[in-house]
Each structure stands twice: as structure tokens, then as C-alpha cells.
């Protein structure tokens, strides 16, 4: 019998073992679709970004005009830009749901996969931040100024570090140039990290909603999950194109239609919606260094998840108390997101402080305690 090239060719064999003949748990739900959706997001962002980069000029005098030129004069330039800007939002929606799934179903117990995933999230956040600066509107400029300035809170080396990052004494042309270079480079770094993430995942195999070993009941990835993933792509690309075509500026800030002006500060400086929860935590602490540490901790706390797991069961499927806590945390994050978009005044200050406190309390104290309590309840 002739050898099957799909199973004998060195390169095709790798693809086959990752996407075609991969043994997959038969009971994984739609929550397991977000990994492939993130892959589609990354591909879309790299393609649209590449096309935008061919028409973009990384210079303070020309950046804003070059983006306007892309939208007005380039064939379908407006569409490419709208897909790229809103594609970032969908990227974050998918990654947050993907992390939520991992947290709910105890996927963080695959430590290497989880840790590379958190590194991927941090890289994505960095990419989105430097990308937001490129159109060189008011919010681009002031967002870059405020967020990079946070590094000056680091004792002893802070100020030097910030001036080194800026390439001068304020956000200016050198900053824009290096941010463009970083924004071009980082997505390819994300692609590389994704391969590492997948390599670690395929070492252990996928988790499943029951959190039990599924070796006795596996099915091939293709055609079952390849088809399921295609349905997922369609269900994501539909709202993305709808948003890009009908209300492309819905999630943006009107302030960014004004070219950057270092002499005029916008009344409310705020990041894109997907950073608002972290921004609210940053603002809730009246001390600069304390705020920066809390901001960093709000994301880095994910690294602690495997260490804080105290339950005998892996998933929350049969743990009603942990489920209640999980959805409280979800509501808490939505409150933080809302507070982050509001001005710094009463009652938003106190709401933000309480929400920040509960965020850390739930993750660091209540989840491990509830896990231990549920173990006790199992014995009754």
C-alpha cells in the first residue's frame, strides 16, 4: 500500500498531528472554540495590519494625515482600517472569554500552557497599547503620555527608564517611530508564542467540561471540530463585519478625531474599553507607585491561579459555591470596566475602590477558601 504523504512527510506530519488526526475529547463544548477564534483574529489582524502599514507614515507631522489618506483615497482603505480597529476589540473579547473558560474549567492546572497563555495576554496588551498610539490623535498622544509615565513611579531608575522609552523628554517623533516598529514586530512574536502554547497543550491534550481524563473517549479533530470551528469563525466574523460596516466608531473615542496636540489635554483621558478594568484598579489607589503595582498585579495574578487551586475537583461544573464566586467576579470585572470609563469623582471613586478590593479578595482569598470548604462538604 502506498504511504500516506499526510502521515509520512516531516512537515505535513506535524500539521496532521495538530489539526487533522489530533485525538480530542468528545465532550468539549463551544467554550473550547475560542482558541481557534483567537488564531483567526491574529491572522486577520496581521493581514489587515500589513495592508495598513503599506500606507502609513510613522512621523508626527504625517501620521494623522496618512491614516486619513488611507481611509479616503486607498481602495477599501476605510474597510481595512475599520476591520483592524474593531478586530482588536474582538481579539480581546475572545481572549477574555478564553481565559474565563480556562478559569472555570480548571485548565490552569496545565501549568506550562496556562503560563504561556498569560504571557500571550501581556504581549497582546502591549501590542494593542502601542497600536493605539499610531493614528496620532489626541487620545493616542495623551494615552501614550499617561501610561508610559507610570514607569517613572519605579524607584531610582523610573525617570531614566521613561526618557529612554520616549527617546527624549516627552512623547514625540522618536516615540512614534519606535512604537510603530514594536507594533509591527509584536504580532509575529504572538504567533511564535502561540506555537509554543499549542506545543504545551498537545503534550497533555485538551481539558474537558467534566475535568476528568478522557483518553478512553477521544475522537479525531477533523472533521468534527474543524467543522465546529468553521461555524465559530462565521459566528464571529458576522458581528465583526457588521460592526466595521455599520458603526465602526462605536468603540472608539471621539477625541481621537482631533490631531495630537501637546498643549491641550483632553477632559477625560481613558484607554480603549478592553483596558478599562485595569485602568479602574490603577485609579482606585491614590498613590502613584501603589497604583502601578495594583495595575500590574491585576493581570499578573493569573500566574497564581494554579497555586491557589485547593479543590479536589478540577472544574467548577459540580461546585455551586465556586460558580457563584466566579459569576460574582465576572460582574465585578464589568463594574470595574464601567467605573474606568467614568470621571474621577464621587461616587465612582469609592465604587472603583470597593470593586478593586473585591477583585483581589475573590481571587486570592475567597476562591481557595471556597475550594477547601467544598472539599469538606464532599465528606458529609
UniProtKB/Swiss-Prot annotation:
Membrane-spanning intervals of the chain: 34-54, 78-99, 114-134, 179-199, 227-247, 289-309, 321-341, 348-368
Localization annotation: Mitochondrion inner membrane
Cleavable signal peptide: none
Chain's role: Component of the ubiquinol-cytochrome c reductase complex (complex III or cytochrome b-c1 complex) that is part of the mitochondrial respiratory chain. The b-c1 complex mediates electron transfer from ubiquinol to cytochrome c. Contributes to the generation of a proton gradient across the mitochondrial membrane that is then used for ATP synthesis.
Binding site for heme b b562: 84, 183
Anything else known: Heme 1 (or BL or b562) is low-potential and absorbs at about 562 nm, and heme 2 (or BH or b566) is high-potential and absorbs at about 566 nm.
Organism of provenance: Mycteria americana
Keywords: Electron transport, Heme, Iron, Membrane, Metal-binding, Mitochondrion, Mitochondrion inner membrane, Respiratory chain, Transmembrane, Transmembrane helix, Transport, Ubiquinone
Binding positions for a ubiquinone per the UniProt entry: 202
Principal localisation: mitochondrion
Family, per entry: Belongs to the cytochrome b family.
Cofactor remark: Binds 2 heme b groups non-covalently.
Any single GO CC term annotated in Swiss-Prot or TrEMBL for this entry: respiratory chain complex III
Membrane topology, record value: Multi-pass membrane protein
Cofactor(s) needed by this chain: heme b
Stored InterPro entries: Cyt_b/b6_C, Cyt_b/b6_C_sf, Cyt_b/b6_N, Cytb/b6-like_sf, Cytochrome_b, Cytochrome_b_C_euk/bac, Cytochrome_b_N_euk/bac, Di-haem_cyt_TM
Protein's UniProt name: Cytochrome b
Quaternary context: The cytochrome bc1 complex contains 11 subunits: 3 respiratory subunits (MT-CYB, CYC1 and UQCRFS1), 2 core proteins (UQCRC1 and UQCRC2) and 6 low-molecular weight proteins (UQCRH/QCR6, UQCRB/QCR7, UQCRQ/QCR8, UQCR10/QCR9, UQCR11/QCR10 and a cleavage product of UQCRFS1). This cytochrome bc1 complex then forms a dimer.
GO MF terms held by the record: metal ion binding; ubiquinol-cytochrome-c reductase activity
One GO term of the biological process aspect: mitochondrial electron transport, ubiquinol to cytochrome c
Residues that bind heme b b566: 98, 197
Amino acid at each position: 500500500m502506498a504511504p500516506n504523504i499526510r502521515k509520512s512527510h516531516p512537515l505535513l506530519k506535524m500539521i496532521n498531528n495538530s489539526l487533522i488526526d489530533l485525538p480530542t475529547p468528545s465532550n468539549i463544548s463551544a467554550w473550547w472554540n475560542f482558541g481557534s477564534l483567537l488564531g483567526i483574529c491574529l491572522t486577520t489582524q496581521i493581514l489587515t495590519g500589513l495592508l495598513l502599514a503599506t500606507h502609513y507614515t510613522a512621523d508626527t507631522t504625517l501620521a494623522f494625515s496618512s491614516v486619513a489618506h488611507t481611509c479616503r483615497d486607498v481602495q477599501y482603505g476605510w474597510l481595512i482600517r475599520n476591520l483592524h480597529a474593531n478586530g482588536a476589540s474582538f481579539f480581546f473579547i475572545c481572549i477574555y472569554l478564553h481565559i474565563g473558560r480556562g478559569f472555570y474549567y480548571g485548565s490552569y492546572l496545565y501549568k506550562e500552557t496556562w503560563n504561556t497563555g498569560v504571557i500571550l495576554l501581556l504581549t497582546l496588551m502591549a501590542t494593542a497599547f502601542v497600536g493605539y498610539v499610531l493614528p496620532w490623535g489626541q487620545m493616542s498622544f495623551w494615552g501614550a503620555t499617561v501610561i508610559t509615565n507610570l514607569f517613572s513611579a519605579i524607584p531610582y531608575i523610573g525617570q531614566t527608564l521613561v526618557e529612554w522609552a520616549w527617546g527624549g523628554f516627552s512623547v514625540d517623533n522618536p516615540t512614534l517611530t519606535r512604537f510603530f516598529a514594536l507594533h509591527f514586530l509584536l504580532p509575529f512574536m504572538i504567533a511564535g508564542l502561540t506555537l509554543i502554547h499549542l506545543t504545551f497543550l498537545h503534550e497533555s491534550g485538551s481539558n474537558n467540561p467534566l475535568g476528568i481524563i478522557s483518553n478512553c473517549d477521544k475522537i479525531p479533530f477533523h472533521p468534527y471540530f474543524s467543522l465546529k470551528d468553521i461555524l465559530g469563525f462565521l459566528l464571529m466574523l458576522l458581528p465583526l463585519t457588521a460592526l466595521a460596516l455599520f458603526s465602526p466608531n462605536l468603540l472608539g473615542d471621539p477625541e481621537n478625531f482631533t490631531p495630537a496636540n501637546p498643549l491641550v489635554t483632553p477632559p477625560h483621558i481613558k484607554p480603549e474599553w478592553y483596558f478599562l478594568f485595569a485602568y479602574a484598579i490603577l485609579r482606585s489607589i491614590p498613590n502613584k507607585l501603589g497604583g502601578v503595582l495594583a495595575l500590574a498585579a491585576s493581570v499578573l495574578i493569573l500566574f497564581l491561579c494554579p497555586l491557589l487551586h485547593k479543590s479536589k475537583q478540577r472544574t467548577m461544573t459540580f461546585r455551586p459555591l465556586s460558580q457563584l464566586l466566579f459569576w460574582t467576579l465576572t460582574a465585578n470585572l464589568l463594574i470595574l470596566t464601567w467605573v474606568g470609563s467614568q470621571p474621577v469623582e464621587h461616587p465612582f471613586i469609592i465604587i472603583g475602590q470597593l470593586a478593586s478590593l473585591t477583585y483581589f479578595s475573590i481571587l486570592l482569598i475567597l476562591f481557595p477558601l471556597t475550594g477547601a470548604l467544598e472539599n469538606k462538604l464532599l465528606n458529609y
